[in-house]
Amino acid sequence: MLILVSPAKTLDFEQPPLTQTHTRPDFLAYSQELIQVCQRLTPSDIATLMKVSDNIAGLNAARFGEWTPDYSIDNAKQAIFAFRGDVYTGFDADTLTPEQLERTQSQLRILSGLYGLLRPLDLILPYRLEMGTALANPKGKNLYDFWGNTLTEAVNNAVAAQGDDIIINLASNEYFKAIKRKQLAGQLITPVFKDFKNGQYKVISFFAKKARGMMARYIIDQQVSSIEELKAFDVAGYYYSEELSKPNEPTFLREAQ
């Protein structure tokens, strides 16, 4: 069972990681190509392209300028400990045991605009480059063009290494669009999380993101290996709804918080 998640805008490069163990991203040569494109952008270009404030644009212009492919644990941090958004709050990597971290390294993959596909212990530098960014590059008009079939092939290879064909998609639509769905060599399962609000169950972004992280952690903790076992997910008040689920979209509901 392979789990796909999105990265996060919020980063933490201050707190020491849980372990010194690390790996090197598989697609650093691709990342270098993108960085070379980004280094030609002015802070004003970045502000317009990424729709961010001047301060954030300036910060990222500096990050692009300082980027280096020479990674070590001294100047970089493992992705699973560096990302600090809602998904990662739900996953809570800082409480993983060594055995759980080993399973996470095997089963979890993080889609990334800059790095393509990351393993949890792959070292990264601080960056911001969302997959939906319309960054013109030598391969096309955006990052979907840039990554092409590369990430789909990488996911297929990672699935094959799991020994089964189940892919749990806990990534956002923006990031999963980088995967060619029809070329996936596996059974794609996309869980849906709905909370009760104003008289109906609906997807609420903040809660859904955190739930994706909690489900990823549940799969690791419980060593889930089948869709039936996944339906037992009951963290933070969520429960499986047979009525609202579709074959490849198991739906989990939660009452008002």
UniProtKB/Swiss-Prot annotation:
<dbReference type="GO" id="GO:0005829">
    <property type="term" value="C:cytosol"/>
</dbReference>
<protein>
    <recommendedName>
        <fullName>UPF0246 protein Shewana3_3143</fullName>
    </recommendedName>
</protein>
<comment type="similarity">
    <text>Belongs to the UPF0246 family.</text>
</comment>
<dbReference type="Pfam" id="PF03883">
    <property type="entry name" value="H2O2_YaaD"/>
</dbReference>
<dbReference type="InterPro" id="IPR005583">
    <property type="entry name" value="YaaA"/>
</dbReference>
<dbReference type="GO" id="GO:0033194">
    <property type="term" value="P:response to hydroperoxide"/>
</dbReference>
